[in-house]
Amino acid sequence: MYRVAFLVLIAAVALPASSLSAREGGPALADAQRAFFNARYQTAADLALALQASDAEALAPYEVRTSALHFQLRDALGKSPDKGKAFKLCATCPELLKAFLTDTKKGQAMARARLQSDPADDDALFFLGKLNLNYVWLHLETLGRKTGWSEYWEARRSLDAALEDNPRHMRARVARAWVDYIVATKMTRGTRWVLGGGSKKSAFIGAREAAGADSEFFVRVEAEFALWEMLVRDRQLAEATAIAQRLALDFPENHKLANFLNAAPAQNLNGRGVQSDTAP
């Protein structure tokens, strides 16, 4: 079985891109985003940290940095099924987790402050939802810890509010699709009911809509990575391969895309197990 990474978490994973105002979206942010989608997570995290210092009010650097830190942590843990043991043996993981939690907390506080001033700020709603989704995905899948339920509910409410105000907010559409996918695939039936329900079908509909929308470059790329990840997990490997081929043209340095494509068609197209680790 192959384990192929993109992140992607969540996501969430995951991947992060942004529909940003001109104030937040300078070339340095694009550099951080491109590094992330090329699977150069340390570079992406460093660039995002520099952006935090240069624009104290921008939320995007916190989302990019926490996503990059999550993927660094995931890569450092490796493939061990015993996630707790792997974390204890990982020399770099405690500092990565500490940095992730610190930046998540700061970003959450900034987003909540913006929403106190303007409850209809759909970008603040999105970033609050996405930061919380990153937190939930890191703990649930990467660390194997069932925690973060308050973050889950805040993510769900924030993303739903953003989409109610702006149904064309494609980043929120992708993040909300990941909520549906996570609940549908990671929770028992009873827990799914408690968490408000989840639907893999709805997740694919949302991801496909966002991937096919006429959006800014990194917004579309994030949606395509999300759809690719879901397709890989669902063993719809022929379509996943076609998407990966398109993405590899824009992100030739992404060795995880290359690893996936190197397994095609022998592994991918015949439906044998291929696992990605790129959400959300």
Task: Please name every model-derived segment.
Residues 24-27, 34-48, 57, 65-120, ...:
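Short coil/linker segments at helix-helix boundaries
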Residues 1-2:
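N-terminal secretory signal peptides that target proteins for export/translocation
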Residues 54:
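Helix-loop segments that flank and shape redox-cofactor active sites
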Residues 60:
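Acidic donor-binding loop at a coil-to-helix junction in glycosyltransferase catalytic cores
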Residues 16-24:
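Boundary at the C-terminal end of the N-terminal hydrophobic targeting segment
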Residues 217-219, 230, 235, 241-280:
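Terminal, low-structured helical/coil segments at or just beyond the last alpha-helical repeat
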Residues 5-16:
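Bacterial N-terminal signal peptides
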